[in-house]
Every structure is written in structure tokens, then in C-alpha cells.
Amino acid sequence: MARAVGIDLGTTNSVIAVLEGGEPTVIPNAEGSRTTPSVVAFAKNGEVLVGEVAKRQAVTNAERTIRSVKRHMGTNWTIDIDGKKYTPQEISARILMKLKRDAEAYLGEQISDAVITVPAYFNDAQRQATKEAGQIAGLNVLRIINEPTAAALAYGLDKGEKEQTILVFDLGGGTFDVSLLEIGEGIVEVKATSGDTHLGGDDWDQRIVDHLVTTFKNQHGIDLSKDKMAMQRLKEAAERAKIELSSAMETTINLPYITASSEGPLHLEVKLTRSEFQRMTADLLERCKGPFNQAIKDAGITVNQIDHVILVGGSTRMPAVVDLVRELTGGKEPNKGVNPDEVVAVGACLQAGVLKGEVKDVLLLDVTPLSLGIETKGGVFTKLIERNTTIPTRRSEIFTTAEDNQPSVQIQVYQGEREIAAYNKKLGMFELTGLPPAPRGVPQIEVTFDIDANGIVHVSAKDLATGKEQSMTITGGSALPKEEIERMMRDAEAHAEEDRRRREEAEARNQADTLIYQTEKFLRENADKVPAAEKANVETAIANLKKAMEGSDVTAIRSATEQLATESQKLGAAMYAATQAAAGGSSGSATGATGSASGSAGKDDEVVDAEIVDEGEK
């Protein structure tokens, strides 16, 4: 049975984990790192770069480098590269393909099944988009689970039978979630969740970038925000400074040759203290309080009832965030035994193990983060499923017509907490037609909402008089038609094929280069010993291989390489034969010399027959 993996598809970094002998193991990528930057770049030569290599070239290729694409999931955002529009799903799929490829190389086997995590506060469109990204990457997405739930699963499985209340405070690169869970006797139950899908470490970085731009403008009168290459350098420097300020009280941001004026090159050097940084990001920290209080209220508990606090996401390493959590939880010390970067992927792979039957006696009960309902007369949002309802779930309600002889009803589906439908997130709409003429208020239309374990919504409407039914799986917002997903999968496969061809070409060229170098070196060093005929053949083969390398036909390069290898072997054989022949003549005289030596030895018997006699035998 193929193994299933758990993937934390993050805004800034992504992680993949697998169960090895029942124990979760984080899989290092091809570069040897346990986290992979969620960065995708399209090189000028058409090559698609993912991870660390994409991040490294971002400064010189800013316009064709995409980072933090998770923030665009579930929207109509696209990026145009060489006349082709890419959706957030396609860009995310590149990251997933890199994780999948590296994991397959590490494990030595194919991977098809995966559990992928999303922020708890992701709406339906964002979840659907994540599932589609997995499909485009060639993965069978077993389940979409919430990041805080995965973290609690990773933390709580070995904590025994005692029931505990756990708070997961998850501040990642681009999203923020707070979840309250109860863990005990193998059951992980989410009681409440709240969050902000547009708050994360990126926002802290941006404050430093804004500060640097303002400082530089005041000093030199030049606005760096107009220079894409400079902005890319500022972003990287801001991220480094933020990380440094988690352990140091002060850091210096030093960027030589950031731009140039009429007088010559200009350099940026700015000192930033931790207190300054905390001052300029105080409002971001303040935004964390709302979702925290909401989750506590929805769970119907007090902070005193929280047994453990788990910090998830790299941004929770900031001292100000740790202090805030301590303050909000009444002085509780956050758990230090959890790696905030890896715990989500570990939980995801445990859930994959549960679904595959490898992990026994574990039940995961998750919730829907936002209320679901439809628009009714007057633009009112009528909720059918309240937020924090345990999923999977199914709810039905009877509605009627607003006009006499109404031939059809339009069902508009929304997700959110506002009383007026238009202020919530519209997930989609469909129409139930063919209603028989009747006065208003008479027809009975049953609307049913069904949320599966992935948190993805299915809606149906049925006229109870005629039995006519209309249903839909919500594909509003960003969700892609099936044909579009299939096209993107083909594209992704074609790119994988293209990457494989590029790799093969590079390997063939390296092999050819090495052989040419070694052969030419051999010819130079043995110029006086090489037979003329074989030398001419080898030189012709070298010329043919160099000509083949001017093109990009891998078969031609390989064929010419083989030809040169064959001619080199013939040359070696000819040289060996010539050396043997020469050695044969000289070995005859050597034998004569040996014969005379033994002859002379025969004349002196004392030397040959001498024996060592033990003193005791005399």
C-alpha cells in the first residue's frame, strides 16, 4: 500500500512529513532543508524554479518570482508570465510538486495520497482552491484539515487518557488562527475556532520595509518603492531583521549599492531596535486579540480552564507575540516542546495515518469556521449551519416563495457572520425551476446544506410538491471547472517532463564535457606514444561531439559521446598493444640477465646453501 504524506502548505514555507514505522518523520528536501520556501519563479529560459533556488534569484528576477501565493487562494488573482495566465492553484501546485518529488526521492517510492492543511479560518473557496492545487500536482487529496487541529493532533496523541483543553495560537507567514480543542482518550475535538486570513509574518516584514523606504527617502530624496529590484532586497533584509530581533535587542540593516543618484551609488544602513520594531507593529499585535476573545467566547470557557498553550507558525517566535499570548491566557507559559515550523505537517501525516488505518483509536472532530446560509427576502442572511458546528454535518430547512405564481427560486449561498447577505462571502448560486403556479407562501422548498470532512459545502434544493431537485457543490469564488483542473494537470505534467528533459540534457552535456576534457588531456600527455591512425579517429570524434553540443538534441549528444568513448577505448587498446610489443622485446633481454645471474649464483654455493644454525644445536 502506497504511503500517505501530510503537507503543511504554508504562506512562507512548506513542510512534508510521513509515518516511518508508525512515527512521524519530516522529510528533508533535495537541498537538505526540512522546510521549503513557498516561492515559485519562472526563469528567463522558461525553467520553473521552486523553493530555495527560486528565493535566491528573486532579486534579479523580481517580476517573475511569486511568493506568499497562499494569500490569493480562493480569489480571481492571476499572474501573467510570457503571455500565459497562472492561477493561485497552479502556483501552489508547483510547490506541492517539488515537495512530492523530493519526498519520492527520499523514500524511494511513489507518493499519491496526501492530507493537506489549511488555516482554520479559510472559507469554502479557499479550501476548494487548496484541494485543486493538490489535484493539479498529481496528488489524491485524502482530506483537507485545519492547521491548529493538526498541531493539536501532533501534540496530544502521546498525552495519555486525561481530558485536556488546549489552545492553539497559530501565527504563520500570512494567516492567523486561534483554536480551542479538547483532547482525551484518542479524541481530538475542536470546540471553537476564529482567525484572520490576512494577518501574518509578511505584515510584520512589510512594516520594516515601509520604515526603510521612508528613512531612505528622508535621507536621499529617492523613493525605493518604485524600484522592484531594490524592493526585493528590502523584503529579504526585513525578514532577516525580524528574525534577528527575536533573539537580539538591536540589528543593523546594511544594503550596499541599493540604488544610484547623479553623484554615484547609494548605500542603505539603518539601525533598528526591538522596541522600535514592536512600536511600529503594535497595531498588528492588537489585531490578534479579537479572534482570541471570539474563540474563548464561542467555546464557552474561561482562560483559567485552558490546560496547555501551543504556539504554531514561525511568527510566534517573536518575543512580543509570546508576551501577548502569556497576557491573554492569564500568565500561562506556552509549550516549548513543539517545533512551530513542523508541528502542522506532523499532525497532517498522523491524520493521513488515521485515514489509511495505520494509526488506530484516534478520532478527529473538526468544525466549520464560518456560518453558512442563503439570502432570503430583503437581502437577509438566513443561517442554516452556525459557525463552530462539528463536521461532517447536514442541515435542512423549508423555505417558500415570495411572489404569487413564482416559476422558480434562486438559491444564493453565503458564508460569514453578517446579518445582511451581501456583506458576507458569496459562495455561489443556482436555480430551482419548474415550480407549479401557486400563491406565495404555499410552495415548500427544502434547502439542504451538507458539509463534508474537508469543510467543502454541497447544497441542494427540492420542491416537496413535485419532487424536483437541484443541487450543487459550491464552486464559487476561485474554484475551477473540472476541465480546467485537468488542463492544468496536463500542463504540470508537461512541465515535469520539460524539467526532466532539461535535467537529462544537463547530465548529457556534463558527461560529454568530462569525456572531451579527459581525452584531450590524455592526447596531450601521450603525444609521442599515440598511434597516428587512432589519434585521427579520436580527434574526429571530439569534433563531432563538440558540434553535437552546439545544439540541444540529447540523443545526438549521447550518440556522439558514445562514439568518442568507443574511439578512446580503441586508442587505449592500440597504445597498450604497442607498449606490450615494446615490453616483449625488452623482456627477452631481461630473461637473459636473469639467467646469467642464476648462473653466477651457481658458482658460489656457499651463498646459495647458507643456513642459519641455532646456537643451542651446536
Swiss-Prot record:
Gene, per the UniProt record: dnaK
Induction (free text): By stress conditions e.g. heat shock.
Record function comment: Acts as a chaperone.
InterPro entries membership: ATPase_NBD, Chaperone_DnaK, Heat_shock_70_CS, HSP70_C_sf, HSP70_peptide-bd_sf, Hsp_70_fam
Residue ranges of the region described as Disordered: 492-513, 579-618
PROSITE patterns tied to this protein: HSP70_1, HSP70_2, HSP70_3
Record-annotated disulphide pairs: none
Family: Belongs to the heat shock protein 70 family.
Presence of keyword Membrane: no
Residue ranges with Acidic residues bias: 606-618
Biased composition (Basic and acidic residues): 492-510
Top-rank taxon, per record: Bacteria
Organism: Acidothermus cellulolyticus (strain ATCC 43068 / DSM 8971 / 11B)
Annotated protein name in UniProt: Chaperone protein DnaK
